[in-house]
Amino acid sequence: VSHSGEGATSAAQRKLFSELKKRYDKSSFERLHVSMTFKKGLVEGVGSENSTRGRSFLFFALGVCAGTGLGRCFVLRVPENGLIALNVPLDPLRLGSNSTRTTHPYYMARWNDLLATLGIDGELRNPYWDKTKGEMAAACRNPTLLKSLVTDSLSCAHPQYARHMGIKGRGIEHCGYCLPCLIRRAALTAAWGTGNDQTPYT
C-alpha cells in the first residue's frame, strides 16, 4: 500500500515495485497506490494545513482500508526503523504536535486500540522498530539487488528541490541535508563503507 502527493515520490514507488516484481516473479504481491492531496480552502473558514502531521493518520487508514478488503484477519506491517521510527525530537520545532509520529510505538498502540474498538480484525506492527537503517542495509539478504535499486529509491523530504534549481536529467535527486537524507547517508556509509553510496545529492 503506497501513497504519493507529488510526482517524484510516485515515480520512485512505481519503478521500485516494477523491479521487485521482476526479481521476485514467483512471489504473489500487488501494489495498491493512492495519490492524494488536499486543495487549499477545502474547508470553508479553515486555514491551509502546511505541515505533514495529518499523513500519519492517512497512511494507516489507507493500509487498514486495504486490509479490511481481504475479508479476514490481517496484519499491517509497517517497515520503518531507527531514529525516524521513534521520531526523537532533535530540536524544539519537533516537540509535541509540531512533528509527525507516524510509527512511534505509542501512536501505533493507540491505532490498535482504535481497531479493536471498531471491531476491525486487524493489527498494525512495526517489526523493525529497534533496528537502524544502517543495520537493515547491512543485513539485507540480497545486497546486490539493494545496491542496484538504491539510487531509484527516494528518502528526501524535498524531492522537488533539484527541479527548482534547474537540475534535470539525473533522475531522482536528494537534497542531502534534510533529516531523511542525513540518515540515509549515514546508514549507507555504515553498511557499505565510505564512498559507496551512489545516491545523487543536490
Name each region found by the language model:
Residues 1-202:
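Nucleotide-activated chemistry modules centered on ATP-dependent adenylation/adenylyltransferase
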